[in-house]
């Protein structure tokens, strides 16, 4: 009898036995307790049998026991000594901080490396942009200088062309009129003097038309027959030279500044050509060309077109040399 009483007392001192006894006094089943505590029936059964589930942490088990005790009106102070035996608190294992510090140092090193990479990238982009801007600015300044130079040359050429007719028109017209008026009278009165007068006319064939007319007007009183013969002689000599095999032909589809010189260094042309204009230049090959707008000009050399596409694609001033023996070179 004493042994059975001792066993009953020991069982009553366990957490599960106290909870089961209180539940039975309230007339609750394990299913009802599980529903109220939102637990599985197996979990309630393990708590009453003083079993600790392997997949349940001790912290959660102690919380379930407290909830069960409040449900069946058992003070928690009575169960604390029993819970310490059934669900002892295990010391948490603190992982060393070495891995975190290593990761932090690695992250910091990666951040510095990424910052340096971005810095190098920005420097490269900045240098590339500065180089492009300087090159573009130099090309624009060169084109502007070429345009100013061509404008100055055109203005000077216009001034010279306006002054020449004013100086030579009066004597030429007067000489021509006097020679025309005196020619019929002189030829009728002295027919024998016209033959020897052809010799000075032949000698004066290389003189410009204006100079020939002035000279004949001055010598009309002494040799009346001379004015009639130089006129057809000078007109026969003023002819357009025949096209040479070394000719350089250029047609312009837009306004373009250019400069052309031959092998002797002589500038065959330097200035601005307007849209629709054309040039036919002759000189000693090779020719050196500098073209401000390559897209606005079409060039033929030795009867073959010259390819300027490489300058048109890059939108640069074209500098090239045209040789008679080889293809055009930049």
Curated annotation (Swiss-Prot):
Functional description taken from the UniProt entry: Cytoskeletal protein that is involved in cell-shape control through regulation of the length of the long axis.
HAMAP family tied to this protein: RodZ
Location in the cell: Cell inner membrane
Keyword Cell inner membrane: yes
Coiled coil among keywords: no
All ranges on the Cytoplasmic side of the membrane: 1-111
Membrane topology term: Single-pass type II membrane protein
Residue ranges: DNA binding: 30-49
Residue ranges, annotated region (Disordered): 146-237
Periplasmic side: 133-330
Protein's name according to its UniProt entry: Cytoskeleton protein RodZ
Keywords from the UniProt entry: Cell inner membrane, Cell membrane, Cell shape, DNA-binding, Membrane, Signal-anchor, Transmembrane, Transmembrane helix
Superkingdom assignment: Bacteria
NCBIfam families (alphabetical): PRK10856.1
Taxonomic lineage: Bacteria, Pseudomonadati, Pseudomonadota, Gammaproteobacteria, Enterobacterales
Biased composition (Low complexity): 176-202, 216-233
GO biological process, one term: regulation of cell shape
Record remark: domains: The helix-turn-helix (HTH) motif in the cytoplasmic domain of the N-terminus is involved in the formation of spirals to maintain the rigid rod shape. As this protein is anchored in the cytoplasmic membrane, the HTH motif may contribute to protein-protein interactions to form the RodZ helix, which is localized beneath the cytoplasmic membrane. The C-terminal domain may be critical for determination of the rod shape by probably interacting with enzymes required for synthesis of the peptidoglycan layer, including PBPs in the periplasm.
Main location as per UniProt: membrane
Record InterPro entries: Bact_Cytoskel_RodZ (IPR050400), Cro/C1-type_HTH (IPR001387), Lambda_DNA-bd_dom_sf (IPR010982), RodZ (IPR023690), RodZ-like_C (IPR025194)
């Amino acid at each position: 009898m004493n042994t059975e009483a001792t066993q009953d007392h020991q069982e009553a001192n366990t957490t599960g036995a106290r909870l089961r006894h209180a539940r039975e006094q309230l007339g609750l089943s394990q299913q009802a307790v599980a529903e109220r505590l939102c637990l599985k029936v197996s979990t309630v059964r393990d708590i009453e049998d003083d079993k600790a589930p392997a997949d349940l942490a001790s912290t959660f088990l102690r919380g379930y026991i407290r909830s069960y005790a409040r449900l069946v009106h058992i003070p928690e102070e009575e169960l604390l000594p029993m819970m310490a035996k059934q669900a002892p608190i295990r010391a948490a294992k603190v992982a060393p901080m070495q891995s975190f510090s290593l990761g932090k140092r690695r992250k910091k090193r990666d951040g510095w490396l990424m910052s340096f990479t971005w810095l190098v990238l920005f420097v490269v982009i900045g240098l590339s942009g500065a180089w492009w801007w300087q090159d573009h600015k130099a090309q624009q300044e060169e084109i502007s200088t070429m345009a100013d130079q061509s404008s100055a040359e055109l203005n000077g050429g216009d001034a010279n062309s306006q002054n020449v007719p004013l100086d030579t028109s009066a004597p030429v017209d007067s000489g021509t009129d006097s020679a025309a008026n005196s020619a019929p009278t002189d030829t009728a009165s002295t027919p024998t003097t016209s033959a020897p007068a052809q010799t000075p006319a032949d000698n004066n064939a290389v003189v410009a038309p204006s100079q020939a007319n002035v000279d004949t007007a001055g010598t009309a009183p002494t040799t009346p027959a001379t004015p009639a013969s130089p006129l057809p002689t000078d007109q026969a000599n003023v002819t357009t030279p025949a096209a040479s095999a070394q000719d350089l032909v250029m047609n312009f589809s837009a306004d373009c500044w250019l400069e052309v010189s031959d092998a002797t260094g002589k500038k065959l042309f330097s200035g601005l050509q307007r849209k629709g204009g054309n040039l036919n230049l002759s000189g000693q090959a090779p020719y050196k060309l500098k073209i401000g707008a390559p897209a606005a000009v079409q060039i033929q050399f030795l009867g073959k077109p010259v390819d300027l596409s490489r300058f048109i694609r890059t939108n640069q001033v074209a500098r090239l040399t045209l040789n008679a023996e080889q293809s055009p070179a930049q």
